[in-house]
């Protein structure tokens, strides 16, 4: 469920050494499955462990995860990175905003997952997003752009060279993508 590097484990052991005996680590997701999802790490006093928590045992400490956060922390990774500017704990949880779907889920769910977890975070850098409207009977993913992508002069390149290539690579059963958006250039447009 959660991978913790050796450097991060050592950091946790150091932090826990100054806490009351029995204190462990809790990893959680606030607003799981939503665009506003945020991951967190906190101390977990012994009296705050719930019977429904997932208990992950590491060499010198344990991590507890509440049942609501657990599916959103699948494939999460915690690292402790040190560089010339200092050090910091990093937590990457690719499924925090969108729960990973099963490999045998319907095509529309799998495509939507890739859009939400891989494509939209990139588009968000420009204030944009894309929504899957449908998959047609002839295997085209019909998309609608929003935010900074609506009216952007680069939207055709983004659609064909970025999104379509990625989706066709991951889903060979698709024939392509179509843009349903009525693009209106304005101040919101990125380019």
Curated annotation (Swiss-Prot):
Alphabetized UniProt keyword annotations: 4Fe-4S, Iron, Iron-sulfur, Metal-binding
Recorded superkingdom: Bacteria
Pfam families reported in the protein's UniProt record: Fe-S_biosyn, NifU
Ligand binding ([4Fe-4S] cluster): 149, 152
GO biological process, one term: iron-sulfur cluster assembly
PANTHER family associated with the record: FE_S BIOGENESIS PROTEIN NFUA, IRON-SULFUR CLUSTER SCAFFOLD PROTEIN NFU-RELATED
Subunit description: Homodimer.
Name the record gives this protein: Fe/S biogenesis protein NfuA
Species lineage: Bacteria, Pseudomonadati, Pseudomonadota, Gammaproteobacteria, Enterobacterales
Primary gene name: nfuA
